[in-house]
């Protein structure tokens, strides 16, 4: 008697079973986060359990309930719901971040491929990147005479440095074997850029972009506290001046969640662009 050694054909999974497995996997991954969240809430409640303690979790929800249930409220001037406050901040971040990405990648490649440019510009970049973001705000206000472009400039000058540095490091770390093959094949500069330099540098570029998006969101919240207008930063500052600590805490939570989503968005794009063997 001979045994049938042929492997059984794998049954094709239905869309419903695949969706169920995905949901189950997501729930299992979320359990530790949920436990940590409730532990932090408990610690928060205990720390604010004195007779005169303020800003208990329940109190924050009660006092800021209108902002929670109506984020799309539209009033006059800066009297806007949290959705519009965050949207205004995100708009400034998007413009400044996009400008920083374009300029940062270009400059990073330039100083990465040219030893002379690296020696000339790297010391300047190292000095400028240590300047705190808000230190640029008075200069930008004096130059642009408007809070909107001034805030965008602060985003730009904050986000550009990690992009430049990581891109340059990526170019400098291209394996020498790649360059040797390019010389043997006599690739043109354009072909070398598209087929060798860019693919090898993409992981480093996205590392810089991921760092930059977090710094951009951090900087715009701080800058808006000084520039005013519609934006989550000025909302926090205005709530503080009004003595509404619950609104301040709620806004801080929203800021953290948006920052998490921005970081996840850049990470998701990187997972689709960066080849698996380079991750």
From Swiss-Prot:
Pfam family, one: BPD_transp_1
CC terms in the record's Gene Ontology section: plasma membrane
InterPro entries listed in its UniProt record: MetI-like (IPR000515), MetI-like_sf (IPR035906), NtrB (IPR005889)
Domain ABC transmembrane type-1: 86-270
Keyword Oxidoreductase: no
Topology relative to the membrane: Multi-pass membrane protein
CDD domains: TM_PBP2
Swiss-Prot/TrEMBL GO biological process terms: monoatomic ion transport; nitrate assimilation
GO molecular function: nitrate transmembrane transporter activity
Compartments where found: Cell inner membrane
Record key words, sorted: Cell inner membrane, Cell membrane, Ion transport, Membrane, Nitrate assimilation, Transmembrane, Transmembrane helix, Transport
Domain of life: Bacteria
Signal peptide span: none
Transmembrane segment boundaries: 98-118, 124-144, 151-171, 196-216, 217-237, 249-269
UniProt key word Ubl conjugation: no
Assembly description: The complex is composed of two ATP-binding proteins (NrtC and NrtD), two transmembrane proteins (NrtB) and a solute-binding protein (NrtA).
Function: Part of the ABC transporter complex NrtABCD involved in nitrate uptake. The complex is probably also involved in nitrite transport. Probably responsible for the translocation of the substrate across the membrane.
Family the UniProt entry places it in: Belongs to the binding-protein-dependent transport system permease family. CysTW subfamily.
Protein name per the record: Nitrate import permease protein NrtB
Species this chain originates from: Leptolyngbya laminosa
Gene responsible for this protein: nrtB
């Amino acid at each position: 008697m001979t045994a049938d050694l042929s492997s059984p054909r794998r049954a094709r999974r239905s869309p419903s079973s695949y969706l169920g497995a995905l949901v189950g996997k997501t729930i299992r991954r979320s359990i530790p986060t949920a436990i940590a969240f409730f532990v932090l809430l408990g610690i928060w409640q205990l720390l604010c359990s004195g007779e005169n303690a303020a800003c208990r979790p329940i109190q924050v929800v009660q006092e800021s309930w209108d902002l929670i249930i109506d984020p799309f409220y539209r009033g006059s001037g800066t009297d806007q719901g949290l959705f519009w406050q965050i949207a205004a901040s995100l708009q400034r971040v998007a413009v400044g971040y996009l400008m920083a990405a374009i300029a940062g990648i270009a400059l990073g490649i330039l100083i990465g491929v040219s030893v002379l440019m690296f020696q000339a510009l790297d010391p300047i970049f190292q000095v400028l990147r240590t300047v705190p973001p808000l230190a640029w705000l008075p200069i930008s206000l004096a130059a642009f005479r408007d809070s909107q472009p001034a805030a965008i400039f602060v985003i730009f000058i904050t986000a550009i440095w990690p992009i430049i540095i990581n891109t340059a490091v990526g170019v400098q770390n291209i394996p020498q074997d790649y360059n040797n093959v390019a010389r043997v094949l006599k690739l043109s500069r354009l072909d070398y850029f598209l087929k060798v330099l860019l693919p090898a540098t993409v992981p480093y570029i996205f590392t810089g972009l991921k760092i930059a998006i977090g710094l951009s969101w951090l900087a715009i919240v701080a800058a808006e506290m000084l520039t005013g207008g519609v934006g989550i930063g000025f909302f926090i500052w205005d709530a503080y001046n009004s003595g509404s600590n619950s609104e301040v805490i709620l806004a801080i939570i929203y800021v953290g969640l948006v920052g998490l989503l921005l970081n996840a968005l850049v990470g998701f794009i990187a997972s689709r662009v960066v080849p698996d063997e380079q991750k």
